[in-house]
C-alpha cells in the first residue's frame, strides 16, 4: 500500500499524502483500519503522512510502544500533541500535500498543518470497499420508545426549537451517531457499536432528509414516510441541497468533511457550531438512566462469574486468548447482550502495561500466579453500554 500511495503522489505531482484513521462519518470505529493496511498499526487512533523519501506515523502517548513494535522500522513514530505534520514540514520549502476531502475537516487540516504546506484534495479511492451485500443481518432497525424514553418526533421538535432560537434555516447532521439518536434507529455498520452510517438534513421547513444506503431501510421505509422522513442515496446529496430553501446552513466543523462543506457553502451561508444533538443526547432521561443501570447489573453478573472462574481455574492451562473468549461466553448468557463494546484487553504480566493491548497468536502469554492480569472489557446491550476494568 505504501507503494500505491507513492504512485499516487507522483501521478498528482505531490510531495506527500496524508491518511487518517477515520472514515467519512468521523466515528471512532470504522470497518477498515487504514493505518493497519498501510503501517501494520492496529491502534484505535492516529494518522499517517507519506512523503517521497520518508514515512511518518503519528500516535498519542497510549500507542508509542505499540506503533514502534508493529510498524517494523518502516515509519518514523511521532507522539501527538508534541509533534504534528506542521512541525516536520516547517523547515522545508512549501510542499504539496494531498488528502481525501471526504475524510478530513477544515478544522483537522488546520491543526495538522497550520499553513505549513499547500494542500490539494485528491479523490483517490485508495481504500475503496467492496459493495456490501444487504441481508437481514445488516438492516437498520428501530429502537422502541420504551428503551430510549423519548420518541423521534419529540426529539425532532426539540431540535427545531434550538434552530429557531438561533435563527438557523437548515442543519446538516454529519455524525451517524447523532442521526441514530435523533431517529431512534440502530444498525450494524461498525464493529463494537450499533451505528447505522447515515447523514441527514433538518430543513428550513422542518423535514428530515436521510442520506445513505437506502436498501438498509427496507424494514422501516413505511414508518419513515409516515413521519415525513425522506431518504436518498449519498450521491443525491448535492441535488437535494440545491432544492432546499433558506439562506443559512449549520454544520459541525468537527464532523463535516471538506467535501460536504464545499458543497454546502456553494449554495448557503455556513454557520459553524457544535451539533446541538451532542448536548441533547448527553442529558439522559429517566428511562435511559434506568436501562443503563440494568445493563451494568447484567454485565456485572457476567464479570463476577468470570472472576470466580479465574480464581478457581488452573492458571497453567490459561492464556490471554482463552481468558478473552471465556469472558465473552459469560456475557452471551444474557439475552439482551449484543456484542463487545470494544476489543477486550486481556494482558498478562508485561502485556498489561501496553495501553489498548490486543492479544494475538504471536503475543499471547500464559497466565502466571506471580504476574498481574489486566482485563479491560465491555458489552453492548439492547439498553446500554458498559466498560469495566479489573
Functional labels for PLM-detected ranges:
Residues 4, 8, 12, 115, ...:
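Generic, well-ordered alpha-helical scaffold segments in large soluble proteins
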Residues 112-113, 385-390:
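Short, compositionally biased
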Amino acid at each position: 500500500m505504501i507503494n500505491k500511495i507513492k504512485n499516487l503522489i507522483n501521478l498528482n505531482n505531490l510531495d506527500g499524502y496524508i491518511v487518517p484513521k477515520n472514515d467519512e462519518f468521523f466515528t471512532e470505529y470504522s470497518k477498515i483500519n487504514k493505518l493497519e493496511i498501510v503501517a501494520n498499526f492496529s491502534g484505535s487512533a492516529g494518522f499517517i503522512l507519506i512523503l517521497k523519501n520518508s514515512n511518518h506515523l503519528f500516535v498519542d502517548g497510549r500507542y508509542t510502544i505499540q506503533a514502534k513494535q508493529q510498524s517494523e522500522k518502516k515509519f518514523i513514530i511521532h507522539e501527538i500533541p508534541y509533534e504534528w505534520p506542521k512541525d516536520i514540514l516547517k523547515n522545508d520549502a512549501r510542499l504539496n500535500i494531498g488528502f481525501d476531502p471526504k475524510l478530513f475537516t477544515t478544522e483537522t487540516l488546520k491543526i495538522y498543518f497550520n499553513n505549513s504546506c499547500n494542500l490539494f484534495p485528491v479523490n483517490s479511492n485508495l481504500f475503496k470497499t467492496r459493495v456490501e451485500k444487504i441481508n437481514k443481518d445488516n438492516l437498520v432497525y428501530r429502537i422502541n420508545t420504551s428503551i430510549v424514553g423519548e420518541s423521534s418526533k419529540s426529539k425532532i421538535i426539540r431540535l427545531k426549537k434550538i434552530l429557531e432560537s438561533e435563527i438557523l434555516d437548515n442543519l446538516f447532521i454529519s455524525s451517524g451517531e447523532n442521526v441514530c439518536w435523533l431517529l431512534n434507529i440502530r444498525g450494524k455498520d461498525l464493529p463494537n457499536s450499533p451505528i447505522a452510517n447515515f447523514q441527514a438534513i433538518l430543513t428550513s421547513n422542518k423535514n428530515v432528509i436521510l442520506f445513505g444506503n437506502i436498501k438498509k431501510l427496507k424494514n422501516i421505509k413505511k414508518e419513515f414516510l409516515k413521519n415525513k422522513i425522506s431518504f436518498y442515496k449519498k450521491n443525491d446529496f448535492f441535488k437535494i441541497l440545491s432544492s432546499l430553501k433558506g439562506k443559512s446552513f449549520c454544520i459541525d466543523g468537527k464532523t463535516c468533511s471538506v467535501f460536504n462543506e464545499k458543497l454546502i457553502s456553494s449554495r448557503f451561508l455556513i454557520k459553524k457550531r457544535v451539533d446541538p444533538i451532542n448536548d441533547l443526547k448527553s442529558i439522559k432521561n429517566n428511562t435511559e438512566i434506568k436501562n443503563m443501570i440494568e445493563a451494568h447489573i447484567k454485565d456485572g453478573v457476567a464479570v463476577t462469574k468470570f472472576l470466580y472462574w479465574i480464581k478457581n481455574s488452573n492458571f497453567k492451562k490459561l492464556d490471554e486468548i482463552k481468558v478473552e473468549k471465556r469472558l465473552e461466553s459469560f456475557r452471551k448468557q444474557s439475552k439482551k447482550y449484543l456484542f463487545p463494546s470494544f476489543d477486550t484487553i486481556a494482558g498478562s504480566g508485561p502485556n498489561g502495561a501496553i495501553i489498548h493491548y490486543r492479544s494475538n497468536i504471536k503475543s499471547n502469554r500464559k497466565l502466571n500466579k506471580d504476574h498481574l492480569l489486566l482485563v479491560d472489557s465491555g458489552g453492548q446491550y439492547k439498553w446500554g453500554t458498559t466498560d469495566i476494568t479489573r
